[in-house]
């Protein structure tokens, strides 16, 4: 099982970014995203609508105390992975990861305690990179694409144009 924590969501600044973090997590097989910062029902509804149409399972949940959540997930047996440009190469460590992974991605400046709580601080390239692209690359490497049996809509790949099939 893979779950995500998006730190420090800010409604005005991060609406699209947090939505894209959630959609990337869903597309690459995560089952849930938690987010901290400002509670944002519009962002939650946007992600839930995509999940309803294109399939799941995938959940969105707001958390006030993300430190307690990280500790709880570790007690439940998850490996806490903090994606940061300052970490070790994720390619060198990906085979050390357990089946249940709790991935932490930043928003605003990440507190030092996150680096201490994480079982792994991993980098995608040791360069400044968006949380969306870093998460996507990481999840693709460890999990590949997700598949969704309960979708109402499926994208039919096309050489040109767009085609959706409704069920």
Q: Where would I find each of the regions flagged by the language model?
A:
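RNA substrate-binding interface of SAM-dependent RNA methyltransferases
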Residues: 1-84, 135, 139, 143-148, ...
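Short acidic/polar capping segments at secondary-structure boundaries
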Residues: 9-11, 108-111, 126-129
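Short, well-ordered alpha-helical microsegments
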Residues: 43-44, 67-70, 89-91, 111-112, ...
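Long, charge-patterned amphipathic alpha-helical coiled-coil/hairpin "stalk" segments used as oligomerization
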Residues: 87-124
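Phosphate-binding and hydrolysis-coupling loops of NTP-dependent motor/remodeling domains
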Residues: 94, 152, 166
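Structured adenosyl-cofactor binding patch, chiefly the S-adenosyl-L-methionine
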Residues: 115-162
């Amino acid at each position: 099982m893979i779950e995500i924590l998006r730190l420090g969501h800010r409604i005005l600044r991060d609406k699209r970014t947090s939505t894209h973090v959630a959609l990337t997590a869903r597309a690459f097989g995560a089952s849930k995203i938690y987010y901290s910062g400002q509670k944002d029902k519009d962002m939650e509804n946007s992600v839930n609508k995509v999940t309803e149409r294109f399939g799941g399972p995938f959940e969105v949940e707001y958390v006030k105390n993300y430190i307690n959540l990280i500790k709880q997930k570790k007690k439940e047996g998850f490996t806490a992975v903090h994606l940061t440009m300052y970490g070790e190469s994720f390619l060198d460590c990906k085979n050390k990861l357990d089946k249940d992974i709790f991935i932490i991605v930043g928003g605003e400046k990440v507190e030092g305690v996150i680096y201490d709580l994480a079982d792994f601080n991993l980098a995608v390239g040791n360069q400044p990179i968006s949380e969306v692209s870093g998460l996507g690359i990481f999840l693709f490497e460890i999990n590949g694409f997700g598949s969704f049996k309960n979708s109402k809509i499926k994208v039919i790949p096309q050489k040109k144009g767009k085609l959706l099939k409704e069920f």
